[in-house]
Amino acid sequence: MMGLFPRTTGALAIFVVVILVHGELRIETKGQYDEEEMTMQQAKRRQKREWVKFAKPCREGEDNSKRNPIAKITSDYQATQKITYRISGVGIDQPPFGIFVVDKNTGDINITAIVDREETPSFLITCRALNAQGLDVEKPLILTVKILDINDNPPVFSQQIFMGEIEENSASNSLVMILNATDADEPNHLNSKIAFKIVSQEPAGTPMFLLSRNTGEVRTLTNSLDREQASSYRLVVSGADKDGEGLSTQCECNIKVKDVNDNFPMFRDSQYSARIEENILSSELLRFQVTDLDEEYTDNWLAVYFFTSGNEGNWFEIQTDPRTNEGILKVVKALDYEQLQSVKLSIAVKNKAEFHQSVISRYRVQSTPVTIQVINVREGIAFRPASKTFTVQKGISSKKLVDYILGTYQAIDEDTNKAASNVKYVMGRNDGGYLMIDSKTAEIKFVKNMNRDSTFIVNKTITAEVLAIDEYTGKTSTGTVYVRVPDFNDNCPTAVLEKDAVCSSSPSVVVSARTLNNRYTGPYTFALEDQPVKLPAVWSITTLNATSALLRAQEQIPPGVYHISLVLTDSQNNRCEMPRSLTLEVCQCDNRGICGTSYPTTSPGTRYGRPHSGRLGPAAIGLLLLGLLLLLLAPLLLLTCDCGAGSTGGVTGGFIPVPDGSEGTIHQWGIEGAHPEDKEITNICVPPVTANGADFMESSEVCTNTYARGTAVEGTSGMEMTTKLGAATESGGAAGFATGTVSGAASGFGAATGVGICSSGQSGTMRTRHSTGGTNKDYADGAISMNFLDSYFSQKAFACAEEDDGQEANDCLLIYDNEGADATGSPVGSVGCCSFIADDLDDSFLDSLGPKFKKLAEISLGVDGEGKEVQPPSKDSGYGIESCGHPIEVQQTGFVKCQTLSGSQGASALSTSGSVQPAVSIPDPLQHGNYLVTETYSASGSLVQPSTAGFDPLLTQNVIVTERVICPISSVPGNLAGPTQLRGSHTMLCTEDPCSRLI
C-alpha cells in the first residue's frame, strides 16, 4: 500500500501537464510573403498557455491593409465560454493612434495606415483575452509587429566639412582623419551599409591621400607631402549606402599640411661689414637677413643667430627681430681702437625649433664673415686702474708724515696707453686735507700729520679722489686713492746701550728701555728680531730687570761693528711698529780692557747681528766686465791680422820682397823682356834610380817638378830649380846643392856636400847656375832660416805667375820660343852667348861693382872658362834621405870644381879632387861652405816655366845665384844612367834620353 500511493500521485501529475500543454491561445498570421509567413509559423508550436510574440512584418512606406489580418489571436477557452479580445500599445491607444485594430470576437488584428520604419521600427501589441466578467482568462502576451525597411534614406555625414592635418614628410599610410556617416535605414542591413570614396582633390595632381571604403579613414598615400609646395588639400568625399550602389551623399575634407623644420635658414648675403667708433655702444649696428622656407612666425622659421668665432671679448650680441626674423647686431661692450682696429666675426644661424629628423643629419654649421671696422677717435685720458692703494710704511710716526711720499698715480692716454702728457692733476675729494698731489708728476704725499683717532680714517684707510684735467680738451678723469695707515705708536720705548764698544774677549752689554712719557709702563720684554733661516743666531738677550736686559754673543766673533735689531714689548703687549736698531762695536782690548782698534760706527753694516763686510764698488765691477769683454774681443781682433803671405791682388798683394840692403840675395831673372806663361806643375814622388845595379839616390822628401816630359828632382837638404823640355832630368843632392840639366840627353846629378856636377850633350844649350857661399855684412854672425828662404821664393814665384800678362816681367824666368836653326841674327841658330847683353846693355858698369860682384859679372858675360874652386866645409857631412820609403846616404868631401864642356859630339864631364867616402851621420844640423846651383834651358820651341824652388832650412844665410848659357846642343839619345866605370871616380858622366822620363 505504501508503494501504490507515490505511483498514483506521479500519474496524476503527468496527466495535468498534458492537459495544460494541449490547452493554448493560438495566434495566426497571414500575409502575402510566404517566407515571412513560414517564419511566423514557427510560433504555432504549442506553448504552455503563452501568446505568440511575432506577427507578419509590415513594409514601411506601403499600404499593408491588403494583408489584413496581419495576425490573429485565439484562446483555448473560446470553446467553453465567450471570450473578448483586446489589444493595446503604440499605434493603438498610444500615438500614433489607430494604426492597428482587433476584431474583439475573432481576434483578427488589422493594419489601417502606412507606417515608417525610421519612426517606429516595430510595434509591440499587448493582447488580452477577457471573459464575460472582463477578467483575463489568459496571461497577457506581447505581439511584436516588425516594420520591414526599404532604402528610403541616403547616408548622412556627421559633418559637412571635415577638418584634418598632417605633418609634411610624414610616412605613407599615416592616418589623417576618419570620416563619419550614418544611414537612417535599418542598421546592419544593406540599405545602411555605406561605402566611401574620394571624388576630387585640390590641388589636383598626384593623389596624396587614400580613403578607406568601409571605415572612412583618410591616410597618406606617399611620404612626399611638402608644405612648401601645398600647405593644404581639399578633398570631396562621397558616401553611398547599399555598399556604394544605393543612395549617396557628399562631404568636404580640408586637410592642412603641418610645417616641420625641414628647411635650413640661409643668409641672404655672403658677408657683412660695418663701422663703429671706439668707446661707443650700439643697439643696432647691423642687421642680418636670412631666408627660411618654413612656415613664418613659427619656431621652425624663427632664426637663432650665434657667433662661431671672433667674439672672444664678448663685445657683441645678436638679437632676433620676431617680426622680420632679422638678426640685430648689438655692441654691448665698448671697443678700443688701440687694442683692436678691426674685428673679424664669424656668425651662423639655426632655428628655434630642432630640425626635423628627416633632415637633421644633413645640417652643417656654415659661418658667414662679418668685418667690423673700429674708427679711432680721440679718447682723452683715464686712470687705469680706476683706483689705487698706497700703504704707509710701518714705523713712521704720525707726527712725521709731512712730506711723506706715497707714490704716483698718473692718468693714461687711452690713445697711446702711455702716461698722459699735458695733464694737470688736482685733488678732488680730500677729507681731512691730509694729501696733496703734484700737478705735473702726479706724486702724492702727506701735507700734514694725522691723528690716528681721526674720523677720516675708516678701517685704517684714508679715501681721496684725484682729478686729471686735459689741458687741451678740458676733459676730466677721476681716480680713487686709498691710503692704508698702520697703528701709529708715537710713545714706544727706546732701547739704549750701556756702552757703544765691548771687548771681543767678553762681548756683552746691558740694554735699557726708556720712554718719553708714562703711557707705556714696564716691565718690558726684550727680544731679538727674527733672523732669516739661513743666518745662524749670533746674539742672545736675557732680561735683567723690568727695564734692562743683558745682550751677549753666543760664539766667538771677530772685531767689527754690529747692527742688532731689538723688539721691545711693554706690560700691555704694545710694541713699536719697527724694531729698534742698535749699533755695537766689538774691538780688540789690551790688558787694561781698552779697545785698541776703533771701527767707524757710522759705516753701514749687515743687520741680524752680522759684521758688515767690504764689497766691490761700481768701478771695480766695471773693470772686471771690461776685462771680460777684452778677452772676448781678442779672437775677433786676430781675424783682422794678416797671417801668411797669400796674394790677394797680383804681384804686390801679400808679398814683401827682400830689402835692398841685403847683399848678394838674388839675381834678377827678367832681363830677357819676354812675357812669361804659366804652366801647371805636378809634384810626383821619384822612385829609386838604378844604374847597373847601383843606387845613386833615394829620398823620401825628393819631389819632381814635371812639365813637358821633363823631371826635376830636389833633395832633402838642398835646392834645385830647373826648366827643361823633353826627357831632361835633374836631381838635387842630399847636402845643400842642386844641379841643372840641359835639353836633349843632357843630365845632371848631384850627390855631395858643396859639389855641383854638370854635363852637356851634343849641340845643345846648357845654362848653369853656381851657388857661392858668402856672408852678408849686416848679418855675418847669423844664418838666414831656410824656412824663410823657402817661403820667400815660393811666394815670389806665385806672385810672378799671378802678374798680369800685359805687365813687363821683372823677376821671373823668360823662355825663348820659336828658336832654331833658321833663326835670323844668330850665328849658331839660337840666342848667342850673352848676345842680348852685348847688343842691348852696356855692362861696363859691372866692373865697378866691387870684388863681390866682379865674379858675378864675369859669369854673366861668359868670360869665366874655368870652374870655380870653392872650399868645402871642414866637417864631413852626410844626410839620410828617404825617397818613397827607401833611405839613401850620400857624402862627398874635399875641394869641388865644376867645369862645363861643349862640342859637336861627346859628353861633358866634371871632375873633383875629392873622393867618395862612406856615409857618415853628421850631428851638426847646419851646413857650411859654398854650393853650386845649375839650371838648364831647353832650345826647343815650347815654353817652359821655372819650377818653384825648395830650400833647405839648414843652408847658410847668404846665397848668390848666377846663371850662364854655354851653347846650343842637340839631343843625345840615352837614358839617365851612371856608368859602372864612373862609380867611385872623381869625374862622373851623366846622360839622358830626351824621349823618356825618370822612372
Swiss-Prot record:
It comes from Homo sapiens. Desmoglein repeat repeats lie at residues 910-935, 936-966. Coiled coil: none annotated. Expressed throughout the basal and spinous layer of the epidermis with weak expression in the granular layer (at protein level). Expressed in skin and mucosa (at protein level). Expressed in the basal layer of the outer root sheath of the telogen hair club, specifically at the cell membrane between the apex of the cells and the surrounding hair club (at protein level). Expression is less abundant between the lateral margins of the outer root sheath basal cells (at protein level). Also expressed in the tongue, tonsil and esophagus. The keyword Lyase does not apply. The keyword Transmembrane helix applies. InterPro entries: Cadherin-domain_protein, Cadherin-like_dom, Cadherin-like_sf, Cadherin_CS, Catenin-bd_sf, Desmosomal_cadherin. The gene is DSG3. It is found in: Cell membrane; Cell junction, Desmosome; Cytoplasm; Cell junction, Tight junction. The chain crosses the membrane at residues 616-640. Residues 50-158, 159-268, 269-383, 386-499 form the Cadherin domain. PROSITE patterns: CADHERIN_1 (PS00232), CADHERIN_2 (PS50268). Disulfide bonds: none annotated. Residues 642-714 are annotated as: Required for interaction with CTNND1 and localization at cell-cell junctions. PANTHER family: DESMOGLEIN FAMILY MEMBER, DESMOGLEIN-3. Residues 24-49 form a propeptide. This is Desmoglein-3. Residues 641-999 are cytoplasmic. SMART domains: CA. Pfam families: Cadherin. Pemphigus vulgaris (PV) is a potentially lethal skin disease in which epidermal blisters occur as the result of the loss of cell-cell adhesion caused by the action of autoantibodies against desmoglein 3. Loss of expression at points of cell-cell contact between the basal and suprabasal layers in blisters and immediately adjacent to blisters in PV. In a PV patient acantholysis extends from the epidermis of the scalp down the entire outer root sheath of mostly empty dilated hair follicles that contain only small residual unanchored hair shafts and necrotic detached cells. Glycans are attached at residues 110, 180, 459, 545. It is linked to Blistering, acantholytic, of oral and laryngeal mucosa: An autosomal recessive disorder characterized by recurrent, suprabasal acantholytic blisters in the oral and laryngeal mucosa. Skin, conjunctival and genital mucosa, nail folds, and nails are unaffected. Normal structure is observed in the scalp epidermis and hair follicle. Residues 1-23 form the signal peptide. A component of desmosome cell-cell junctions which are required for positive regulation of cellular adhesion. Required for adherens and desmosome junction assembly in response to mechanical force in keratinocytes. Required for desmosome-mediated cell-cell adhesion of cells surrounding the telogen hair club and the basal layer of the outer root sheath epithelium, consequently is essential for the anchoring of telogen hairs in the hair follicle. Residues 50-615 are extracellular. Induction: Induced in the hours following cyclic mechanical strain in keratinocytes. It is a single-pass type I membrane protein.
